Amino acid sequence: LQLKVPMVLFVTEDLVDFVRKRRGDDIIVNMDGGIGGSWTADDQTEIIIQDIDEIPYYHLKDNIQEILDSEEYKKNMADPERIECKQAMYSVIQYSKFRWLIQSLAYNGKECDYFFWLDAGASRFFEGYDLSKEYPSEEAKKSLKDMGDSFLVQMNTEYYKDLVNAETLSLDYLYDNRSYVLGSMFGGHKESIVKVHDIVDNLLKNDMIANRNVNNEQIALGYLIKKYPDVFSLYERTNGKHMDLFQELG
């Protein structure tokens, strides 16, 4: 929360004071969770209050849980003991990241051209980053501009060489447990946010749930970066650091 960058934060009402104390800047609080607001270039924080049942994909929770509990799913899925294979809310939150990015566009899409998702717990991977610096750096902003309207993700190249080097991945990969794309941080130009939301939403509903399958958003992105290479820009991690992309943009 102390990172010097404009933020849109989606929280339950009990966390508003916690955020206020740690952001310490101009804050807009949207009490009804609706889309709209009055973001200006001078504002640094917008807090969107949402109850649990207002999480974008909450309406899929019972359907997902029914799939996860089925014997067919446990038989077909690699490593079905993973938390995302047992608790529906995990996938509800993971896939809601993309809808939250869309909602962020509605608040300040006229003021900002680039949007990134950052997990609430991602600060444990900042590795001593100097929080007094503006984020991202001017050099990083130039790199983002040079990227055009693509969506930036970190691809971890060190471990699953067959996945990294594959030209395409079959739908069988949606049952895999080998994630090679970072899910803690991703984003890009506002035009790409809409494109990626739509293809992720389609994958979740029509390639996963319709076939009685649910897997995490890293698996989804790993499949999609191969299927739609023109939509994505890839930062190839080679040093084993979990969130090296964060440092690269700093």
Specify the residue positions occupied by each region the protein language model found.
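Short, acidic, metal-binding catalytic loop of nucleotide-sugar glycosyltransferases
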Residues: 1-6, 22-27
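Short beta-strand/turn micro-motifs composed of small residues
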Residues: 9-11
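Short, charged/polar "capping" segments at the starts of alpha-helices
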Residues: 13-20, 161-163
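Short coil/turn segments at secondary-structure boundaries
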Residues: 21-23, 62, 129-131, 198-200
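Active-site-proximal specificity loops/subdomain of glycosyltransferases
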Residues: 25-109
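GT-A fold catalytic core of metal-dependent nucleotide-sugar glycosyltransferases
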Residues: 89, 93-152
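Catalytic core and acceptor-binding pocket of nucleotide-sugar-dependent glycosyltransferases
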Residues: 122-128, 149-151, 158, 167-250
